[in-house]
Amino acid sequence: MYHVNRIYPKKELSQCFISSSHITDKIVNYAGNISDYSIIEIGPGLGTMTYSILNKNPKRLISIEKDSRLMPIHKKIVDEFNGKYEFILSDALNIDLRTIIEPPVKIIANLPYHIATPLLMKWINYIDFFTSFTLMFQKEVADRIVAQPNNKNYSILSVLIQLLSNVYKMEDFGPEIFSPQPKVMSSVINIIVLPKPRFNVNHNKLSQVLKVTFGERRKMIRSTLKKLINNTDEILQSLNINNNLRPENLSIEQFCKIANSI
């Protein structure tokens, strides 16, 4: 399809286009009802996912794309869906989505893999603005997002996302659905935002705890937490947390208790 449009994917933008509407329809269906929601799509590419979204009749769709070569394709879609679709030529990392759309909002996207994690970390800062995210990630990143304690993939991302939402891996996809084919597997995940965080916690302090512990994840927390807490052993004992544990063994609640003790 990109050959027909004379648009060749740029490696520096992590462009891997999905040309099959069967696949994009399936991804959009994972988002559930969208007719009562405004939708944001990041990296719409050749518009296959864009059409899948618009065909499910959202209140409104805004797509954000950095590659100006794709503008003519999306101008045609704008004209076709008069008033329903808006195309913004910009870098999504530089946009506060709260300034361009009104809630309720869902994000549906095949994210460019090189900015997928930075985008998600940015959106976490105002996650209560959104209802849900249905996102295609590199499988390795998706596995980190949904990982539970005592799993090698359990990470800072796991804790921060799951503190604020319910996460579900919907489906894994092979490289063959993309053009060009990446060298990795991909996964679609659903992130359903909770009405409030699972536990009350100071998010700045939690981030500090996560950084010092996962920064040296093979070390026991009694060692790494000394960078933040003087009387580490006493505090961990008072919280009934084994000081010989490593960060991948701690629950989200335990991380929050430690953060609240600083």
From Swiss-Prot:
GO terms for molecular function: 16S rRNA (adenine(1518)-N(6)/adenine(1519)-N(6))-dimethyltransferase activity; RNA binding. Specifically dimethylates two adjacent adenosines (A1518 and A1519) in the loop of a conserved hairpin near the 3'-end of 16S rRNA in the 30S particle. May play a critical role in biogenesis of 30S subunits. Belongs to the class I-like SAM-binding methyltransferase superfamily. rRNA adenine N(6)-methyltransferase family. RsmA subfamily. Its EC number is 2.1.1.182. SUPFAM superfamilies: S-adenosyl-L-methionine-dependent methyltransferases. One of its GO terms (cellular component) is cytosol. NCBIfam families: ksgA. It holds the Pfam family RrnaAD. It is an enzyme of class 2 (transferase). It comes from the Bacteria. It catalyses: adenosine(1518)/adenosine(1519) in 16S rRNA + 4 S-adenosyl-L-methionine = N(6)-dimethyladenosine(1518)/N(6)-dimethyladenosine(1519) in 16S rRNA + 4 S-adenosyl-L-homocysteine + 4 H(+). It comes from Ehrlichia canis (strain Jake). PANTHER family: DIMETHYLADENOSINE TRANSFERASE (PTHR11727), DIMETHYLADENOSINE TRANSFERASE-RELATED (PTHR11727:SF7). InterPro entries: KsgA/Erm, rRNA_Ade_diMease-like_C, rRNA_Ade_Mease_Trfase_CS, rRNA_Ade_methylase_Trfase_N, rRNA_adenine_dimethylase, SAM-dependent_MTases_sf. Signal peptide: none annotated. HAMAP family: 16SrRNA_methyltr_A (MF_00607). Its main location: cytoplasm. This is Ribosomal RNA small subunit methyltransferase A. Keywords: Cytoplasm, Methyltransferase, RNA-binding, rRNA processing, S-adenosyl-L-methionine, Transferase. S-adenosyl-L-methionine binds at I18, G43, E65, D91, N110. It is found in: Cytoplasm.
